[in-house]
């Protein structure tokens, strides 16, 4: 068995790994770089079978549905088998309805897998392991072929609401690993970095801010970061507030198929449809979706009566509405709960201007979706693979400080396992 990291040895995101054995090939992840320009097709790696169907390419395996791992999927040949977690598929299909450039994932050759249930892709035996990450339904993979055992960590952490999963992983039969690809997004950060800040910490900090606020609270977070939605919801419950989100978030929550999560019909959850989304619903005739999620629907009139009762999961599409409802901005608070780098990008220019104009302070409360150095060291020590290859990192040389088994690879280099 041989592997090639087409992209990921010198950057965070854009992962694409190819395995080859017995004349068959398997691709793991197909993401766009974090600094990608608008013409995404240019980032598709030069791999036989991606554009034109090739029987030698047995399939594409997806660890999770963040864009830096799946963003190039719309450019593959639709006949090529594509494998991802069943909840990931459901979320992806729901989310795609709202994308500016809509892509119909139903046209692809989609296949599902489930946690710890082994399956075959060509000669490769795949065992997926559910991991704690900021994307719902994220996996690492044990891949066996030719008597070799290869482990791909995917993106992971132990600071989320599924932190137990890393201990469960250690209890699996994952000794005698010939080669491990392990992420190193935050390998260079020290222990004071927010990589050690947990989702429970996020919840507690939000409770403090919610209780101090005398008005409406805006929280900017990803609707697909289900752990974060839960943290916000729990903070709402503990500060006597309601969580308010839009139809997009309602459909994402529905797609998890998990009634334990804050769904649109849950107590203390309300639905608010911003103007831009109302136009989308009308133009696309999404009336069934709207009806399905409208049992707790509220309007501006409801928020105006008791703004201190609500926490709004805020997105850019809300700007038009709140520019016309200036009175609701009095005593309001804005909590930013994403990676700090996004806030300085052009996409956030209108939000920055909105906050500045209305003198609304930005408060950052966030927890990383990635393993810190101590966890990376723990995984390497517990699993003790013969060869360790860093990926999804800008600091691969640091791994040499952790183990003498580290091999620092370059993009497009073929490596024998």
Which positions does each model-derived feature cover?
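Short, acidic/turn-prone active-site loops that include or flank metal/cofactor-
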Residues: 32-33, 87-89, 156-157, 247-250, ...
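Short, aromatic/basic amphipathic alpha-helical patches
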Residues: 94-102, 255-264, 347-356, 399-404
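C-terminal regulatory/interaction regions
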Residues: 11, 234, 238, 278-417
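Hard-cation-handling environments
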Residues: 192-331, 391
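Short acidic-hydrophobic, aromatic-tinged amphipathic segments that line or gate anion-handling sites
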Residues: 109-115, 271-275, 407-409
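His/Asp/Glu-rich metal-coordinating catalytic cores
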Residues: 1-61, 67-227, 231-238, 242-246, ...
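Short, charged/polar "capping" segments at the starts of alpha-helices
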Residues: 36, 88-93, 250-255, 342-346, ...
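Short connector loops at secondary-structure junctions
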Residues: 31-32, 185-188, 248-258, 366-375
């Amino acid at each position: 068995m041989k592997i090639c990291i087409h992209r990921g040895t010198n950057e965070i995101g854009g992962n694409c790994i190819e395995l080859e054995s017995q004349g068959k090939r398997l691709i793991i992840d197909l993401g766009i770089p974090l600094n990608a320009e608008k013409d995404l097709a240019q980032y598709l790696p030069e791999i036989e079978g991606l554009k034109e169907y090739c029987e030698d390419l047995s399939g594409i395996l997806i660890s999770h549905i963040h864009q830096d791992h799946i963003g190039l999927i719309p450019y593959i040949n639709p006949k090529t088998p594509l494998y991802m977690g069943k909840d990931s598929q459901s979320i992806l299909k729901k989310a795609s309805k709202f994308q500016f450039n809509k892509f119909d994932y139903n046209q692809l050759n989609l296949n599902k897998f489930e946690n710890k249930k082994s399956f075959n892709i060509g000669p490769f035996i795949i065992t997926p392991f559910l991991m704690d990450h900021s994307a719902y339904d994220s996996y690492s993979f044990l891949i066996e072929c030719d008597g070799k055992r290869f482990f791909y960590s995917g993106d992971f952490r132990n600071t989320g609401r599924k932190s137990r999963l890393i201990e469960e992983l250690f209890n699996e039969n994952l000794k005698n690993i010939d080669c491990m690809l392990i992420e190193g997004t935050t390998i260079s950060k020290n222990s004071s970095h927010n990589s050690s800040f947990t989702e429970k910490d996020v919840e507690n900090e939000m409770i403090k801010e919610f209780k101090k606020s005398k008005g409406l609270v805006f929280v900017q977070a990803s609707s697909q970061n289900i752990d974060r939605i839960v943290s916000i919801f729990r903070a709402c419950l503990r500060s006597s507030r309601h969580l308010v989100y839009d139809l997009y978030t309602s459909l994402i929550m529905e797609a998890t198929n998990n009634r334990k999560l804050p769904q649109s019909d849950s107590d203390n959850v309300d639905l608010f449809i911003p103007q831009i989304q109302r136009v989308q619903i009308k133009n696309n005739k999404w009336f069934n979706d709207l009806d399905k999620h409208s049992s707790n629907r509220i309007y501006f009139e409801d928020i105006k009566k008791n703004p201190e009762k609500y926490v709004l999961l805020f997105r850019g599409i809300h700007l038009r509405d709140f520019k016309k409802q200036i009175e609701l901005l009095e005593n309001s608070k804005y909590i930013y709960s994403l990676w700090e780098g996004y806030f300085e990008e052009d996409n956030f220019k209108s939000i920055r201007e909105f906050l500045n104009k209305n003198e609304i302070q930005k408060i950052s409360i966030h927890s990383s979706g990635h393993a810190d150095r101590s966890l990376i060291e723990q995984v390497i020590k517990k699993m003790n693979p013969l060869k360790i290859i860093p990926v999804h990192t800008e600091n691969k040389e640091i791994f040499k400080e952790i183990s003498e088994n580290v091999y620092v690879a370059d993009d497009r280099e073929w490596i024998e396992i």
